[in-house]
Structure formats: structure tokens, C-alpha cells
Design a protein with these regions (language model features):
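Helix-loop-helix hairpin linking two adjacent transmembrane segments in secondary transporters
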Residues: 123-167
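C-terminal transmembrane helical hairpin of 12-TM major facilitator-type secondary transporters
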Residues: 260-310
Length: 402
């Protein structure tokens, strides 16, 4: 997850440098298109990962995904032309898109009852840590070196992470049980069962929530430095805001995870969306710098931290035999929002709006996400109570879902 966070923020941190790189002469709209190639790869990786997970296990799938991300980073670092840079970004997306659908159900199954959100939040902190590291690298090392160095650091980080993951990442207990009992590995039908009654409405709801969350995360992380530049902040301060945004996602995300374990998922998810919207709009004001820093941290809690809560909400709303399929479908379809985020952000900035309206436009997905979460109500819990028992086990899903 740290590697995923590094990639997510690396592109946003290097966006101003890409626009200023004279040999390529890139427009704002074209950089937005480049930013969308990674989410396209994520969409494909998320939808296909179930087949690899069923065949090779969640641990092995995660290790392969880390290697793919690292290879894509090296391709970006060595790219002599924008087209090859775009290919590298797409390859990175394939790997990143496969990581969480393989790891998410594993985390959920290993976490003790009543601590599902907390354990997921702790793992999700890796995304914020990686994002903060990417922003720090951009802030301290890129001056005078160009954007290629950022991606070289990311590729090296992936290579260093592989042996650590190989040594310490456990396999799913469910997968071990199936193999040791000589039972056939699940054939992936869970991916299609989640698209049939009584789960169809729940799946559509989660796809929409994930789509709005990813649109917000990728849009803000890609364009926050440029947004702050339009508000007359220098580039170095603008990159500092990325560090604070991901700090807020770490600290605030854990606080919201603890709340979700006590009160259920729906309220904290709604609160995160609303906090994100309010903070993004507040960033457009000329606030004293310490106050602005606090606002950006709050924005990170809401805009970036919400996805970890949604991931657990998905996992706890389906039986164990459908859990990986549900996460893969919801996050895969939700990646459409990740594709749209950088592109829409590029269009907004290219439209030449007043700086305040740029920020308001970026806050709209957060408002829609809060409204959708409130309107969804207890659909997940209702569908869970109507569902048939699991074909292999009568295992209940965990915890409250409203």
C-alpha cells in the first residue's frame, strides 16, 4: 500500500515539472490524459485480479503486482517521449489495481472481530505514508534534476519491498484451507453472484461510492499543487500541501476507522465526504498559513481517508465466498472515477475559471458521495439479511453495516 501511495502522489507532485519540461511541450489537458492512463490500468487490473488470485493465491498475486508496479516506474523514469511515459503509467496501474483486491479480503479475514476498520485503516496508512514520501522526494530532490528521478526512486522502492513482502506477507487462511483439503480453488463465480439479486443493488451502490471516492482522491492528488499555484502559492509550498493532505489521511483515517468499528460504517463515511468537500472549498480562501495547513490536513482525512472505510464496508456486506469478487468488482468499476479525476481536473483548470471555482468544482464529488451514502441507508444490511447461506460455509459477515 505504501508503493500504491507513492505512485498516486508521484504523478501529482511531478505535474508542474511535466508541464514545464520543454522537450515535450505538454498541455494541461494532455497531462490530465496521461494521469488517466494509470487508473485505466487499475480498472483492468482490479477486474482481472480475481482470476489470478483464485489460481495463485492472494499472497503470490500481491507479489507479482508489486513487481509490475516497479517495472512501470522504471519505464516512466527512462521514458524518452510522452508515449512511452504513458505506457509506463498504464503498467503501473495494472499492478496497483491488483494489489488491494488481493489484499483487502485477506486483511478483513485476519483482523479480529470489532477491529476490522482499524486493521484496514492501519494498512491503508501505507498509502498515505507512500504519498507523503513521494511529496517529500519531489520537494527535496527534484530541483535541478527533472521529474524522471521521482519515478526512479519509486522503482527502486518496489524492488526493495519485494523481498520484505516475500518474507512476511501471509497467505489467506481460506485459500490454505481449500488447498490442504484438496478442494478445488474457487472458480471466481462470486464476481458474477454479486451482480445478481439480492446483491445487485448493494453492488451498484458500492461501485458508485468507490467511483466518487476515487474521482476525488485522484483528482485532488493529481492537481492539488497546480490548484494551489492558481491561488498564488509557490511550487514548493504547493508540494508541501500534498504531504499534509496525506498526513491527514493517515491520522484522520485511523480516527474514523475507530469510530466506524464502534458506530458502523455509514456515518463515518458520510462525515469523511462532507469534511473533504468543506476543506477543499476552504482552501480557496486566503487563510493564514497555519490555518490553511490545518484545513489541508482535514481535507486529507475526508477526501483521501474515506476509501479505507468503503473497502471494509464492502467486505463486511458479503459472504466469505463472494468477498474477493465483490471487492474486485466495486473497486474495478470504481476506477472509472479514478480515470475521470485527472482528466476532469485538467479540463477544469484549462477552462480558465476563477481560482475559487476551481476548488468548488473539485468538491462536487465529495458532496455527491455524502448524499449517496445517506440515501443508501441500510441497503447493505437488508440485502445481507435476505441472502442465502454460503455454498461452502454458513459464515456471517462481520459487524454493523449501517
Amino acid at each position: 500500500m505504501t508503493l500504491e501511495g507513492f505512485d498516486l502522489v508521484a504523478f501529482g507532485a511531478t505535474t508542474p515539472l511535466l508541464l514545464d519540461y520543454r522537450p515535450w511541450h505538454l498541455s494541461v489537458a494532455f497531462v490530465g490524459l496521461l494521469g488517466s492512463l494509470t487508473p485505466i490500468g487499475m480498472l483492468i487490473g482490479s477486474l482481472l485480479v480475481g482470476q489470478f488470485t483464485d489460481r495463485f493465491g492472494r499472497r503470490r498475486t500481491t507479489l507479482i503486482s508489486i513487481g509490475v508496479v516497479s517495472a512501470g516506474m522504471f519505464a516512466c523514469a527512462a521514458a524518452p517521449v510522452p508515449a512511452l511515459f504513458g505506457v509506463g503509467r498504464f503498467v503501473v496501474g495494472l499492478g496497483v489495481g491488483a494489489i488491494y483486491p488481493a489484499m483487502g479480503p485477506l486483511i478483513f479475514e485476519l483482523a479480529p472481530a470489532g477491529r476490522k476498520n482499524l486493521f484496514s485503516g492501519i494498512v491503508q496508512c501505507g498509502t498515505a505514508v507512500g504519498g507523503s514520501f513521494a511529496a517529500l522526494v519531489a520537494n527535496t530532490l527534484l530541483t535541478g534534476h527533472g521529474f524522471h528521478l521521482e519515478y526512479l526512486v519509486g522503482g527502486i522502492a518496489g524492488l526493495l519491498l519485494l523481498p520484505l513482502a516475500f518474507a512476511w506477507l501471509p497467505e489467506s487462511t481460506e485459500y490454505h484451507r481449500a488447498v490442504s483439503a484438496s478442494a478445488p480453488v474457487p472458480d471466481g463465480r462470486g464476481r458474477w453472484l454479486v451482480l445478481k439479486p439480492p446483491y445487485l443493488g448493494t453492488t451498484v451502490m458500492f461501485c458508485a461510492m468507490a467511483g466518487l471516492s476515487f474521482l476525488l482522491i485522484f483528482g485532488v492528488n493529481t492537481w492539488l499543487p497546480k490548484l494551489m499555484q492558481t491561488a498564488d502559492y509557490p511550487l514548493q509550498d504547493s508540494q508541501t500541501f500534498l504531504v499534509l493532505l496525506n498526513l491527514g489521511a493517515t491520522v484522520g483515517g485511523l480516527a474514523m476507522a475507530l469510530l466506524a468499528d464502534r458506530a458502523g460504517s455509514r456515518g463515518p463515511i458520510t462525515a469523511c465526504f462532507l469534511l473533504g468537500a468543506a476543506a477543499i472549498i476552504a482552501m480557496s480562501a486566503r487563510l493564514p498559513l497555519p490555518v490553511l495547513y490545518a484545513v489541508v490536513i482535514i481535507g486529507g482525512c475526508g477526501a483521501v481517508g474515506v476509501q479505507g472505510l468503503i473497502n471494509v464496508y464492502i467486505s463486511r456486506s458479503y459472504p466469505v465466498t463472494m468477498r474477493a469478487g465483490a471487492v474486485g468488482v466495486a473497486l474495478g468499476v470504481g476506477r472509472l472515477g479514478a480515470i475521470a479525476g485527472p482528466t476532469l481536473g485538467g479540463w477544469i483548470l484549462a477552462a480558465g475559471l476563477q481560482p475559487r471555482w476551481n476548488f468548488v468544482s473539485f468538491a462536487v464529488p465529495a458532496v455527491l458521495g455524502a448524499a449517496l451514502t445517506l440515501a443508501a441507508g441500510g441497503r447493505a444490511l437488508q440485502n445481507q439479511s435476505r441472502s442465502a447461506p454460503s455454498p461452502r460455509a454458513k459464515e456471517p459477515t462481520a459487524g454493523p453495516t449501517q
